C-alpha cells in the first residue's frame, strides 16, 4: 500500500464560470430601448423587426415595446412598438 495519496485528485477541481446565457425576457413582456433580450453563442435566436444583434450575438431592443417570438425554420425575436 502507498503511504502517500496519489497526485490525481489534486489536479482536478477546476471549472469555468457560467456565462449566464439564454433568454432574459419572455414573450409578451414590455421592454425599453437597449434592453437585452437574449444572450447567446451563435444565433440560436435570430433578430427580426426592431431587434439588433451585438458583436457577441446578443439580441437587444431597438424600440420600446412588447417582445414577440415567432418560430418557423428558425426562432425569431421581434419587438412590437407601443
Curated annotation (Swiss-Prot):
Pfam families: Ribosomal_L27
Record flagged with keyword Transcription: no
Region: Disordered, residue numbers: 1-26
Xref: SUPFAM superfamilies: Ribosomal L27 protein-like
GO MF terms, alphabetically ordered: structural constituent of ribosome
UniProt GO BP: translation
Disulfide bonds: none
GO cellular component annotations of the record: cytosolic large ribosomal subunit
Keyword hit for Ribosomal protein: yes
Keyword terms: Ribonucleoprotein, Ribosomal protein
Coiled-coil positions: none
Family: Belongs to the bacterial ribosomal protein bL27 family.
Protein's name in the database: Large ribosomal subunit protein bL27
Lineage: Bacteria, Pseudomonadati, Chlamydiota, Chlamydiia, Chlamydiales
Amino acid at each position: 500500500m502507498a503511504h502517500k495519496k496519489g497526485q490525481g485528485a489534486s489536479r482536478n477541481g477546476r471549472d469555468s464560470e457560467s456565462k449566464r446565457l439564454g433568454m432574459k425576457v419572455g414573450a409578451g413582456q414590455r421592454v425599453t430601448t437597449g434592453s437585452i433580450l437574449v444572450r447567446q453563442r451563435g444565433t440560436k435566436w435570430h433578430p427580426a423587426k426592431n431587434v439588433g444583434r451585438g458583436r457577441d450575438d446578443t439580441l437587444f431592443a431597438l424600440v420600446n415595446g412588447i417582445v414577440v417570438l415567432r418560430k418557423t425554420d428558425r426562432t425569431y425575436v421581434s419587438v412590437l412598438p407601443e
